Amino acid sequence: GYKVTYFAIRGLAEPIXLLL
């Protein structure tokens, strides 16, 4: 399902973002 991909991307993108 796309939700798994969505949450995986969110989980990776949020800390990156915060670091940048």
Curated annotation (Swiss-Prot):
Taxonomy, superkingdom: Eukaryota
UniProt: glutathione binding residues: 6
Keywords: Transferase
Signal peptide positions on this chain: none
Substrates-to-products reaction catalysed: RX + glutathione = an S-substituted glutathione + a halide anion + H(+)
Protein family per UniProt: Belongs to the GST superfamily. Sigma family.
Protein name: Glutathione S-transferase 2
